[in-house]
Amino acid sequence: MRKRISAIIMTLFMVFMSCNNGGPELKSDEVAKSDGTVLDLAKVSKKIKEVSAFAASVKEVHTLIKSIGDLAKAIGKKIKTDETGTLESSTADQNEQLVAGAFQVVSTVKGELESLVQVDGISDDLKAKVNEAKNANDGLLSKFKSSAKDNESVKKDEEAKKVIDRTNASATELKKLDTAVDELLKAANEAVSAAIAELTAPAKS
């Protein structure tokens, strides 16, 4: 995100350097590009700020979802006592707390996605992708709740993998959420790039 902000600042600087070299009289928030295009900098800057904040929030959601994969690596494991900081096999089928931790992550994501769909100024396409991710997240939450009905079952290594290990063939809900969040992040980044491009793109003929 720091690199993106730096790129925005550099682009704004380039626009200012190339603008207002003659042409019609402009309002205080307007600049004229070398091709004659008039930009409302206040409006464009506001759009860039909004879409960048949206993309940053999506990145946080993406990071949370991907962290479930790290939790899955601890199924049936414990920290070694030799201070190496690595994991080793432990008593099998004792995963209820691990699954509960993953459930909390997904519950947090639910709240984040509900907030994102309410953001003003984002495109209908982005809202649709947020809703797709939200629906996929709800599906995974339902799987957690279904698994929790049988506490003895959710403890088992193989049952835990079906919920939170994306390499498991039965973890279809998690894989669906992974795909939806990947697509949402890609679309959010493209929206930021498009907003920045408004500063440099030539006027349409």
Swiss-Prot record:
Major location (coarse): membrane
Residue ranges of the TM segments: none
Localization: Cell outer membrane
Lipidation (S-diacylglycerol cysteine): C19
Function: The Vlp and Vsp proteins are antigenically distinct proteins, only one vlp or vsp gene is transcriptionally active at any one time. Switching between these genes is a mechanism of host immune response evasion.
Name of protein: Variable small protein 11
Signal sequence coordinates: 1-18
